[in-house]
From Swiss-Prot:
The protein's required cofactors: [4Fe-4S] cluster
Domain Radical SAM core: 157-395
Name recorded for this polypeptide: Ribosomal protein uS12 methylthiotransferase RimO
PROSITE patterns: MTTASE_N, RADICAL_SAM, TRAM
Residue stretches of biased makeup (Low complexity): 8-19
A GO molecular-function descriptor: aspartic acid methylthiotransferase activity
Protein family per UniProt: Belongs to the methylthiotransferase family. RimO subfamily.
Span of domain TRAM: 398-463
Amino acid sequence: MPAMSQNPPLLRPDLAPAPIFDTSRREGQPTIGMVSLGCPKALVDSERILTRLRAEGYAISPDYKGAGAVIVNTCGFLDSAKAESLQAIGEALAENGKVIVTGCLGAEPEYITGAHPSVLAVTGPQQYEQVLDAVHHAVPPSPDPFVDLLPASGVKLTPRHYSYLKISEGCNHACKFCIIPDMRGKLVSRPAHAVIREAEKLVEAGVRELLVISQDTSAYGLDRKFATERGHRAHITDLARDLGQLGAWVRLHYVYPYPHVRDLIPLMAAHGESGGLVLPYLDIPFQHAHPDVLKRMARPAAAARTLDEIAAWRAVCPDITLRSTFIVGYPGETEAEFQTLLDWLDEAQLDRVGCFQYENVKGARANDLPDHVPDDVKQDRWDRFMQKAQAISEAKLAAKVGHRIEVIVDAVDGDGATCRTKADAPEIDGNLFIDEGFEDLAPGDIVSVTVDEAGEYDLWGRL
């Protein structure tokens, strides 16, 4: 059997060297092959993919015959490079039959599948997770005593009972105060089945709460045209419903107030066929309320519409908790515009609020806007805003006194148990404290408590 093709020597002057693989393996170990084409940057991508696969227990095969499947990391820089990539894919299909395509030419999936419709998967450049997921599907990993030292959930920097679940990278918006699109690019959504697979592994490892994050959660799947792959549709409503079936709390963050967010609310309501699958909690970055400020920010929302949306959400799910963040002192913000924000907050009655004083960020377009607000004025507006937000929070928490609610335990020490309600995300929201009868509790426990006391941001209760 022929060895797998390597880079021809004269394709381009910036060509990467032919990869050298460590091909040692144990009996029964799953194997994968790699054909790496193109420039040194592509070679680094191949190295990263192979590093992840080796860490998961895969061996690297030096030839087609010994590989359970073959990854072809393509180049699409020139027409000649595209032709070489198609040729390499065809060779891998002929010699092995199971081929996963990635790399620059993967950004044109129809071009590849038009020539080779039998490839298992096509992913774009730097889409490492999608490549790994395709490998797992084609060549399932097997247990290895050394690999098993790594927790099933991976290396996490959060407590074992909750985990952040990233569903996409990048953002399609062009907010003038933000440089995220410049740093992370346009929206790139993970396949829904890959998200679900990660979530399943987390829950199996003991995670009780999944915190769904991205730059724009409600836009999830837009770049994938909301496609259905392996039984899961890449749309936030479908994804939330699927995640809600796993038995863990599901909390949604960074949700822009698009009209289709209304479809999420029935999943949060206590009643209905799909009710209770998702926590009644939405983290929505409104940023401001005055239409002129929003326009200067280049934000994709208007204050009047958001009030209508809030009313519609609460009509379906009266217990919904709404969290948001705001910027005061944005360039050009007048006292009248700020007062509009205060009036809007009075009407919106948000449960959880964060506020930032505007600061220039290197590379942000807002830096060049006229009429920057003096620091002392920004501080005064922040103080007034937070005073109003605090009063709203205190009143809403006071209304919970005497009620029986469900909480998740975050920590237990000699003084008591620190918990969170369904209305509280870790780190950014409040807590519920239990001072008596907590000795048998452990982090990750979900228990019912009676609320005895309320403060500005926190609650106290008893089992």
